Amino acid sequence: MATWNNLNLQNGASPLMEQIIFFHDHTLIILIMITILVGYLMINLFFNKYINRFLLEGQMIELIWTILPAITLIFIALPSLRLLYLLDELNNPLITLKSIGHQWYWSYEYSDFNNIQFDSYMIPSKEMKFNEFRLLDVDNRIILPMNNQIRIMVTATDVIHSWTVPSLGVKIDANPGRLNQTNFFINRPGLFYGQCSEICGANHSFMPIVIESISINNFIKWINNYSS
């Protein structure tokens, strides 16, 4: 989750988010190099006294400033396209989770098991415990096993919502009458926080998401206890 005074991206808890962070750093380095080059050229242009009244054309420099940006865009576009295809790829998910957005809470259904469904509301400030986070903790967490491929299907019953967990690199719109899906792979245990990322009404800010990642053995125990 985002911590106080942190200006960076959240730590990646999935291979996809780690790839997104790497792509961000890769693109940022290219942009810094471009900024330094353009700044150097502008400073030289403004502060030198050289004048050439007979310069009518410069085919070589025009060729350079046409080819260099094209090559730069290729170095940015290829990793970006690779990530876009990875975002849409589903790799034999072990579990399917269905998330339904409401004004202003989430409902969850475990499609692979019978009668495992619940609503997830934000815990009001007056009912919070000492170690819980304001506006982020919920009464019913999503329990998922780590080191397994998870598919999530998202929809809504009223207005457009957006199911988002930044540390997993997941952001998917919840549209009424439409079922969207994506997948993620959690590679470590812990709690991962998210929120609705589409303005959906007066209490839009009060639709948090909490995923609790546990081992597969503990997940099976949780399924058995919930079913019984």
Swiss-Prot record:
<dbReference type="InterPro" id="IPR034210">
    <property type="entry name" value="CcO_II_C"/>
</dbReference>
<keyword id="KW-0479">Metal-binding</keyword>
<keyword id="KW-1278">Translocase</keyword>
<keyword id="KW-0460">Magnesium</keyword>
<keyword id="KW-0812">Transmembrane</keyword>
<feature type="transmembrane region" description="Helical">
    <location>
        <begin position="27"/>
        <end position="48"/>
    </location>
</feature>
<comment type="similarity">
    <text>Belongs to the cytochrome c oxidase subunit 2 family.</text>
</comment>
<dbReference type="InterPro" id="IPR045187">
    <property type="entry name" value="CcO_II"/>
</dbReference>
<feature type="binding site">
    <location>
        <position position="196"/>
    </location>
    <ligand>
        <name>Cu cation A2</name>
    </ligand>
</feature>
<feature type="binding site">
    <location>
        <position position="161"/>
    </location>
    <ligand>
        <name>Cu cation A1</name>
    </ligand>
</feature>
<dbReference type="GO" id="GO:0004129">
    <property type="term" value="F:cytochrome-c oxidase activity"/>
</dbReference>
<dbReference type="Pfam" id="PF00116">
    <property type="entry name" value="COX2"/>
</dbReference>
<feature type="binding site">
    <location>
        <position position="200"/>
    </location>
    <ligand>
        <name>Cu cation A2</name>
    </ligand>
</feature>
<keyword id="KW-0186">Copper</keyword>
<dbReference type="GO" id="GO:0042773">
    <property type="term" value="P:ATP synthesis coupled electron transport"/>
</dbReference>
<keyword id="KW-0813">Transport</keyword>
<feature type="binding site">
    <location>
        <position position="200"/>
    </location>
    <ligand>
        <name>Cu cation A1</name>
    </ligand>
</feature>
<feature type="binding site">
    <location>
        <position position="198"/>
    </location>
    <ligand>
        <name>Cu cation A2</name>
    </ligand>
</feature>
<feature type="topological domain" description="Mitochondrial intermembrane">
    <location>
        <begin position="1"/>
        <end position="26"/>
    </location>
</feature>
<dbReference type="InterPro" id="IPR014222">
    <property type="entry name" value="Cyt_c_oxidase_su2"/>
</dbReference>
<keyword id="KW-0249">Electron transport</keyword>
<feature type="binding site">
    <location>
        <position position="196"/>
    </location>
    <ligand>
        <name>Cu cation A1</name>
    </ligand>
</feature>
<dbReference type="GO" id="GO:0005507">
    <property type="term" value="F:copper ion binding"/>
</dbReference>
<dbReference type="InterPro" id="IPR008972">
    <property type="entry name" value="Cupredoxin"/>
</dbReference>
<feature type="binding site">
    <location>
        <position position="198"/>
    </location>
    <ligand>
        <name>Mg(2+)</name>
    </ligand>
</feature>
<keyword id="KW-0472">Membrane</keyword>
<feature type="topological domain" description="Mitochondrial intermembrane">
    <location>
        <begin position="83"/>
        <end position="228"/>
    </location>
</feature>
<keyword id="KW-0679">Respiratory chain</keyword>
<feature type="topological domain" description="Mitochondrial matrix">
    <location>
        <begin position="49"/>
        <end position="62"/>
    </location>
</feature>
<dbReference type="InterPro" id="IPR001505">
    <property type="entry name" value="Copper_CuA"/>
</dbReference>
<keyword id="KW-1133">Transmembrane helix</keyword>
<comment type="function">
    <text>Component of the cytochrome c oxidase, the last enzyme in the mitochondrial electron transport chain which drives oxidative phosphorylation. The respiratory chain contains 3 multisubunit complexes succinate dehydrogenase (complex II, CII), ubiquinol-cytochrome c oxidoreductase (cytochrome b-c1 complex, complex III, CIII) and cytochrome c oxidase (complex IV, CIV), that cooperate to transfer electrons derived from NADH and succinate to molecular oxygen, creating an electrochemical gradient over the inner membrane that drives transmembrane transport and the ATP synthase.</text>
</comment>
<dbReference type="InterPro" id="IPR036257">
    <property type="entry name" value="Cyt_c_oxidase_su2_TM_sf"/>
</dbReference>
<comment type="subunit">
    <text>Component of the cytochrome c oxidase (complex IV, CIV), a multisubunit enzyme composed of a catalytic core of 3 subunits and several supernumerary subunits. The complex exists as a monomer or a dimer and forms supercomplexes (SCs) in the inner mitochondrial membrane with ubiquinol-cytochrome c oxidoreductase (cytochrome b-c1 complex, complex III, CIII).</text>
</comment>
<dbReference type="GO" id="GO:0005743">
    <property type="term" value="C:mitochondrial inner membrane"/>
</dbReference>
<feature type="binding site">
    <location>
        <position position="204"/>
    </location>
    <ligand>
        <name>Cu cation A2</name>
    </ligand>
</feature>
<feature type="binding site">
    <location>
        <position position="207"/>
    </location>
    <ligand>
        <name>Cu cation A1</name>
    </ligand>
</feature>
<feature type="transmembrane region" description="Helical">
    <location>
        <begin position="63"/>
        <end position="82"/>
    </location>
</feature>
<dbReference type="Pfam" id="PF02790">
    <property type="entry name" value="COX2_TM"/>
</dbReference>
<protein>
    <recommendedName>
        <fullName>Cytochrome c oxidase subunit 2</fullName>
        <ecNumber>7.1.1.9</ecNumber>
    </recommendedName>
</protein>
<keyword id="KW-0999">Mitochondrion inner membrane</keyword>
<keyword id="KW-0496">Mitochondrion</keyword>
